[in-house]
Curated annotation (Swiss-Prot):
Similarity comment: Belongs to the glycosyltransferase 7 family.
Residues reported to bind Mn(2+): 229, 322
InterPro entries linked: Galactosyl_T, Galactosyl_T_C, Galactosyl_T_N, Nucleotide-diphossugar_trans
Record topological domains on the Cytoplasmic side: 1-11
Protein's organism: Danio rerio (Zebrafish)
Protein name per its UniProtKB record: Beta-1,4-galactosyltransferase 5
Binding-site list for N-acetyl-D-glucosamine: 291-294, 333
Transmembrane segments: 12-32
Catalytic activity of the protein: a beta-D-glucosyl-(1<->1')-N-acylsphing-4-enine + UDP-alpha-D-galactose = a beta-D-Gal-(1->4)-beta-D-Glc-(1<->1)-Cer(d18:1(4E)) + UDP + H(+)
Length: 381
């Protein structure tokens, strides 16, 4: 074969390889962002863990140097270094057999809260979960509302779950979360906000809709924004309102139980009603996967709030494996995030319009809504 033909053939094969590689990359970045971001978050989390380990090692070395200096001088060194905030001694949980009266406010650290849970990811029908929960506690009422009767609930908490086509996940979430909240003696209600129509998934706008609908039912103290595929592993991860804004899902199994980055606010988070109104809720402009949690973090910081997180192993969650393709990537999120502060007063609870279809189910209130961009108009930014 002549040399110039061999060269053309190799060039063609090279171009074909580059085309295949680029189209595959675009598919994973745009159509299957969860796979790409899962590995990206793991790399970021590893970096944070390495920096934290180096910091702690440095503190330990410093302590040894200081102790040695005191020893040489023949004096005692009494100060104790605190290498990590998780080393601090927590308030103990109440002992078994502790009794409280119905007119007393429920304690926050009850003996019924056992700690690590046995997570069962096997699929189960929703009506089977309903039977199990009603058998365990008949006090669970329509709409997923419950309150304790052996003490006065300290907090009234609305759980908002954004939803589309995850019918196999809801029963698993309820099977674990409802009994945990009952053991925490919280008054709670579940709101599943289901997006209808063909627009890309808008998790943030669904949360805004859910907030407005939940506030029509009851004067809740706080709201928790809860992804349907996040299963808590420890019932001592208290869902009360006292330390909000709060990021609950600190350590997720698919990120190797590490925080992807310091500003990460996704999965499960919560704010008081007053805080959420003050920051104008979530942004409505994030269509598709990614960015809305980072924008919420920015809004919280702009308002001067400090986010708290559960210590140690309390913030562990497992993610239900997905058997279908996730939502498409929102490629415009970085542009919006750069203008978070300017957009905060324009885009959120105050510019949202919608027409919901509300139905009361046994374990939750379902809010079905068709979303479109003209439901939350905002000037060009």
């Amino acid at each position: 074969m002549p040399t110039h033909l061999r060269f053309r053939r190799r060039s063609f094969l090279g171009l074909l390889f580059l085309f295949s590689l680029s189209t595959s990359a675009l598919y994973f970045i745009y159509s299957a962002p969860g796979i790409v971001n899962e590995y990206l978050f793991m790399v970021q989390a590893r970096g944070i863990q390495i920096r934290e380990n180096v910091r702690n090692m440095g503190a330990q070395v410093l302590e040894q140097v200081v102790r040695s200096a005191y020893s040489i001088n023949g004096t005692d060194y009494t100060y104790e270094f605190n290498f990590s905030e998780t080393d601090a001694s927590p308030t103990p949980f109440l002992p078994e057999g502790f009794t409280y009266k119905p007119e007393q406010v429920c304690p926050e650290k009850l003996p019924s809260m056992k700690g690590r849970l046995k997570v069962n990811m096997s699929e189960i029908a929703l009506d089977e979960v309903e039977k199990l929960l009603k058998l365990n506690d008949p006090g669970l009422s329509v709409g997923g509302h419950w309150k304790p009767h052996d003490c006065r609930p300290r907090w009234k908490v609305a759980i908002l779950v954004p939803f589309r086509n995850r019918h196999e996940h809801l029963p698993i979430l309820f099977r674990h979360l409802i009994p945990a909240l009952q053991r925490q003696r919280l008054q709670f209600g579940f709101y599943v906000i289901e997006q209808a129509g063909n627009e890309p998934f808008n998790r943030a706008m669904l949360f805004n809709v859910g907030f407005k609908e939940a506030m029509k039912d009851l004067n809740w103290d706080c709201v928790i924004f809860h992804d349907v595929d996040h299963i808590l592993e420890n019932d001592r991860n208290y869902y009360g309102c006292g330390e909000m804004p709060r990021h609950f899902a600190v350590k997720l199994n698919k990120y190797s139980y590490m925080l992807p980055y310091e500003e990460f606010f996704g999965g499960v988070s919560g704010l008081t009603v007053k805080q959420f109104k003050r920051i104008n809720g979530f942004p409505n402009a994030f269509w598709g996967w990614g960015g809305e949690d980072d924008d919420l973090w920015n809004r919280v910081q702009f308002a001067g709030y400090k986010v708290s997180r559960p210590h140690g192993e309390l913030g562990r969650y497992m993610s239900i494996p997905h058997h279908h393709r996730g939502e498409v990537q929102f490629l415009g999120r970085y542009k919006l995030l750069r203008r978070s502060k300017e957009r905060q007063s324009l885009d959120g609870l105050n510019n949202l319009n919608y027409s919901p279809l509300v139905s009361r189910r046994s374990l939750y209130t379902n809010v079905s809504v068709t979303l479109s961009r003209d439901l939350a108009p905002v000037a060009d930014y």
